[in-house]
Amino acid sequence: MDKEELFQARTNPDFLKYLNETRVNSIKAKDIALMYETLDSMLVLDLDEEQINELYQEILKLAFENVEKIINKNKKLKLEDEHLFYARALYEHAIEKWSNENFDGAKELLFVMVNLIEDELLQKALNVLIIFLSSKMELDEFYDSKVDLEKASDEKYGYFIVNFNFDSQKYLKENKRILEQEYENLKHLIVEHK
């Protein structure tokens, strides 16, 4: 969308009414895909921050409720259908914690995700993030200096940082002890749920 199209969408009362109805209905229906579609539209259009935050909180609430059900069934999250959106919500919440310099909170959430996600590439990427979080590197510095912004990845990874400007496999090997120590410190988070 160009600036003119964004302005038209932002000022079109019918579209805004539709978007608000969709927001309300997606929350009532507990439809995480529709909730995210609405949230993404609201963010692009830079609409009411309070409604955006309310919708985001509903997404987190729904994701955590459903992830708990999945854990209680001893299942794992696959990066497809609504599971992809649950993973996105947990991940975005972890990144939000990191951006607020809550390194331990972000690390805990990413650790739980590593043990919950059924996807090797994402698990490795999350482990890389855990190692950087252990050094308390700020998110902006990490993003500017360690993320490969040019490399395209599979669409299902579009919500996650999986491309780095270094050999992540080698990095994981070189930092194996740090990761093992973090796992030891965080294992209580998953043992309690088993």
Residue map of PLM features:
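Extended ligand-binding groove/face enriched in aromatic
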Residues: 52, 64-88, 93
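TPR repeat positional signature
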Residues: 34-39, 86, 90, 127
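Structural signature of alpha-solenoid helical repeat junctions
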Residues: 78-85, 102-105, 122
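N-terminal alpha-helical interaction modules that lie
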Residues: 1-73, 132-194
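Short coil loop/turn residues that delineate tetratricopeptide repeat
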Residues: 65, 119-120
